[in-house]
């Protein structure tokens, strides 16, 4: 297969290339003692999660999508570039936490590794027991930690590639993740986009050192129109900073800042609303009537911020369409809440009117099908333990333009 062209200007243009992360050893680091800290609601059966993810990737390939695996991209970047290796090691080894003697010894060891084992440690972490050198008599940190404690924290949320980067037009945005357990993820995506041969000419639309914003909060409603959820993860400052960056680079003319609840069940905008067609969204019924948006528009020398309006009205106006269709799932409040928690509204569009969804959300999927949307179901008994659906697990890198 030839390399698919890169760039996205919508949520629903035919998908050509996507970045996924096959779950691996980092999920095996989860225990009842750390899963909350690492943002997982349970302990996934890793082998089954891998089977489910393989089926997801195979489905995309069967539809002509080029699947790029994050672990492969990371290994290839580390293999090609000494600067990439130094960048990854520097981000992983925290001298403030480990102390100078241990940090220096660990960094020296990591520099000796080939690309594949180094990539594994950068993703799956390392415990004190796994250190390949003896106890350093100068390191109080080494002496006072339990052997099972992490000297490098694992990154189980790499599974959700949507959040650490997203594409808009021909550019990529490296996000600024707000939760401590995820901050280092952006160092890996930044490394990949900076050093992998596939992305060397790609320019940036946002940088990780900017105000907090996460890809799950960003919806490309139409060419030039971007919705940004503001809640638990993305801040108002992040939404405003993204808007100004997109305006400066002529990547958008309108950004809709959408307030959402600051709670885990609605951590990102895409947990309650995703696009399923050029003029249609599926939305959590319990917030449909209350969801609002602050339109931010470019003007000479700055921006204008309008008063909040109903989201569906503000979106339709910005998109230049008469009405934004909201798929009426017709669910009672209890069923709606259950299926929202299981990522029923978190769909991945492969083309206009064609989406991937978790099979367990039978009621939502049935309503989508009744509305003319082709639903491609995938299993999710284990993938869902981190609270993310098909959209969360995918970073589209190439779509046909609308």
Curated annotation (Swiss-Prot):
Keywords: Arginine metabolism, Cytoplasm, Hydrolase. GO terms for biological process: arginine catabolic process to ornithine; arginine deiminase pathway. InterPro entries: Arg_deiminase. It is found in: Cytoplasm. GO terms for molecular function: arginine deiminase activity. Pathway: Amino-acid degradation; L-arginine degradation via ADI pathway; carbamoyl phosphate from L-arginine: step 1/2. It is an enzyme of class 3 (hydrolase). HAMAP family: Arg_deiminase. PANTHER family: ARGININE DEIMINASE. Belongs to the arginine deiminase family. This is Arginine deiminase. It comes from Mycolicibacterium gilvum (strain PYR-GCK) (Mycobacterium gilvum (strain PYR-GCK)).
């Amino acid at each position: 297969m030839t390399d698919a062209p890169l760039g996205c200007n919508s949520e629903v243009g035919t998908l050509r290339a996507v970045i996924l992360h096959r779950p691996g050893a980092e999920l095996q680091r989860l225990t009842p003692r750390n899963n909350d800290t690492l943002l997982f609601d349970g302990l996934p059966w890793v082998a089954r999660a891998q089977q489910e993810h393989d089926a997801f990737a195979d489905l995309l390939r069967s539809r002509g999508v080029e699947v790029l695996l994050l672990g492969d991209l990371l290994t290839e970047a580390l293999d090609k570039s000494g600067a990439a290796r130094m960048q990854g090691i520097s981000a992983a080894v925290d001298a403030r936490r480990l102390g100078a003697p241990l940090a220096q010894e660990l960094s020296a060891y990591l520099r000796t590794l080939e690309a594949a084992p180094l990539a594994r440690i950068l993703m799956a972490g390392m415990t004190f027991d796994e250190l390949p050198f003896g106890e350093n008599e100068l390191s109080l940190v080494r002496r006072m930690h339990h052997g099972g404690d992490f000297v490098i924290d694992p990154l189980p949320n790499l599974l959700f590639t949507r959040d650490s980067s997203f594409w808009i037009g021909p550019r990529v945005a490296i996000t600024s993740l707000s939760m401590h357990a995820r901050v280092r993820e952006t160092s890996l995506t930044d490394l990949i986009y900076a050093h992998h041969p596939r992305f060397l000419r790609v320019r940036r639309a946002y940088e990780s050192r900017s105000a907090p914003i996460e890809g799950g909060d960003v919806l490309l409603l139409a060419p030039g129109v971007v919705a940004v959820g503001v809640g638990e993860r993305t801040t108002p400052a992040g939404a405003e900073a993204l808007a100004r960056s997109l305006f400066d680079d002529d990547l958008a003319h309108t950004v809709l800042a959408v307030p959402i609840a600051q709670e885990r069940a609605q951590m990102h905008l895409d947990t309650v609303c995703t696009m399923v067609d050029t003029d249609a969204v599926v939305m959590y019924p319990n917030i449909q009537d209350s969801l609002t948006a602050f339109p931010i528009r470019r003007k000479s020398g700055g921006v204008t911020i309008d008063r909040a309006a109903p989201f569906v009205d503000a979106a339709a106006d910005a998109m230049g369409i008469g009405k934004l269709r909201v798929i009426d799932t017709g669910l009672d409040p209890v069923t709606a809440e259950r299926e929202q928690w299981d990522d029923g509204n978190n769909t991945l569009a492969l083309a206009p009117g064609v989406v991937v969804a978790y099979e367990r959300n039978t009621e939502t999927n049935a309503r989508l099908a009744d509305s003319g949307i082709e639903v491609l179901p995938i299993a999710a008994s284990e993938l869902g333990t981190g609270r993310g659906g098909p959209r969360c697990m995918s970073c589209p890198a190439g779509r046909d333009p609308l």
